[in-house]
């Protein structure tokens, strides 16, 4: 039928609307993404492509927000290594997310606290990991609301590393 495309579009639009807030289970969000991708494959020249891309972006942002909140939870509960793993996964999964600066910022805070609370034999290595995270934000994102604080942390980390380099 000549209305199949339109029916499929209204179906995915409805599935998209069933996607819950990021704080809830995201099974419906993942399903919506799958269905929108299926629509785009089935109808590559559809008049609904722009709307589908807007829906996809919003759904992906919701998944990224959920993963960022998990990363922040690990940081806030002093689960330093879990936060590092969550950050690595976030960077791999959402490389182009507008939430990337915030994710890097929390990795900086996490690594800074982790280094400060570490045993002496681990401090230099952990301060270097913190400095790497600082540089990742500073180099990849010119001006963010986190830049000033991250620059201060980077400055302190460099001072801490000088102590270990002079031993």
Annotate each predicted stretch with a short phrase:
Residues 1-167:
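Acidic, polar-rich low-complexity tracts and alpha-helical solenoid repeat scaffolds
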